[in-house]
Amino acid sequence: DTDRSRGLGDVYKRQAQGKGLRIQPAVQTQAEPAAQTLTVTPPQLTLPCRAAILIDQTSGTVLYEMNADQTMPIASITKVMTLLLTFEAVHAGRLTMDTAVPVSEHAYHMGGSQIWLEPGEQFTLDEMLKAVCVSSANDAAVAVAELVGGSEPAFVQQMNARAAELGMEHTTFRNACGLDTEGHLSTARDVAIMSRTILTTCPEVLHYTGIWTDTLRGGQTQLVNTNKLLRRYNGITGLKTGTTGGAGVCITASATRDGLNLIAVVLGAP
C-alpha cells in the first residue's frame, strides 16, 4: 500500500544523517566494480512482510534489509528475468519489437493473470511485452519465453544460467511466469540484483513498466497496470508486482526522486 512504500522510500533520507554500522554493498551486477563502503545507521523498521531490501540503484549500496537472504516464492517478480533475457535477445539482434510472437497450446493453458490468448494468435513482441509488464499476463510471458528459448523448459535453463552469472546464489527458477511451483524460489537480495541489472542494462523496460493503461486487439482488450504505486507514489518508475497464494503480495519497485535511484523489494506481504 501507499504508506508502506513511502516508508521504504524515506529510508535513504534518514540514513544520510547517520553514522555507525559499516555496510558493505551486497548487490552488484557482473562486470561492475563494487561500490564504496558507506557508513550508515540502519533504520529501525519492522515491516509487515517476510523479507525486504532497499538499495541505491546507482551504487548497489544496501540501505535497508530484513531477511534478505531467506528463500521464498516471488510470484510474478519472476517475469523480471523473463524480460531481462528477452531484452538481451533484442540487443543481440536475434529479435526486434516487431517480431511476431506465436501462441502455443502450452501458453494458452497458463492460469492466473492473463490476456486470454488463443492458440494460433500472433502479437508483436512489443504488444506481448506490454501484456507482461502492465497486466502481468502469464500466457504472454510463456509465449515470449517460447519465442526466445524455443520452449519454456529450455528458457528456464537460460533463466537459471543467467541468475548464476549475476550471483543470484539462492535463486532457482522452475517456470517463466512465477506461478507457484515446488522449488521455484528466490530471495529479496537476489531480486534486487536482478532488478538492478535490468534497470541498468535494459532501461527501455521502464517504457513498459511505466504504462498505466493500454489496449490490445484493436481496443478490445484493456490493460491496466498491476503496480498501483504508479498512481500514488511520486517518482515511481516500475518495476514488477507479484501475488500468489504461496508468495503472498510481492513487489520490486523502482523510483527516482531528487537525483536518487532506489530499488525496494518487498516479499510475502499479507
Predicted regions and their residues:
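Active-site-adjacent loops and short helices of periplasmic peptidoglycan-processing enzymes
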Residues: 19-189, 199-202
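Single conserved hydrophobic/aromatic residue that forms the stacking wall/gate
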Residues: 1-15
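Conserved catalytic motifs of the protein kinase core domain
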Residues: 7-8, 50, 259
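Domain-scale selection of a single, long terminal region
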Residues: 13-18, 270
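Domain-terminus/edge residues, biased toward the C-terminal soluble/receptor-binding domains
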Residues: 168-172, 176, 180-270
